[in-house]
């Protein structure tokens, strides 16, 4: 994996969007599976990556939370309910940029999305409970 080539390609994108409102920047590890990006890297790999991320001392902040997420896929709307804080948010996620990198052993996806706070009535298609690690 040529990390410098990835940084050279995504840093200008990050710099262009970092001061915009409601922006999410995400880096995902996984494998291209046809037209999908499959982030199921296996439990052992996930634990090794998470251990390495937690070890790094330079993060501005680290946060782990358990949330229930309800999705309306056709409108890209999701409700996040944080069990610890009781906070609920509803956002509409709009993809801004996706950059994919074929690497070995895992591929990398860099995403920028606009997460616009919204409200209204939506029928939710599915629910997932996630433990989220944010750095």
What is the predicted role of each segment?
Residues 1-135:
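Phosphate-end processing signature that detects enzymes handling 5′-triphosphorylated RNA
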């Amino acid at each position: 994996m040529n990390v410098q080539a990835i940084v050279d390609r995504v840093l200008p994108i990050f710099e262009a969007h970092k001061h915009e409102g409601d922006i999410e920047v995400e880096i995902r590890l996984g494998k291209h599976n046809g037209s999908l990006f499959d982030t199921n890297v296996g439990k052992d790999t996930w634990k090794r990556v998470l251990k390495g991320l937690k070890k790094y001392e330079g993060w501005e902040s680290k946060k782990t939370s358990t949330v229930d997420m309800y999705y309306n896929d056709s409108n890209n709307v999701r409700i996040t309910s944080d069990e610890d804080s009781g906070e609920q948010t509803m956002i509409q996620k709009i993809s801004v940029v996706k950059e994919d990198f074929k690497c070995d052993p895992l591929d990398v996806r860099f995403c920028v999305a606009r997460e616009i706070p919204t409200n209204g009535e939506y029928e939710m298609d599915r629910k997932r409970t996630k433990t989220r690690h944010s750095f």
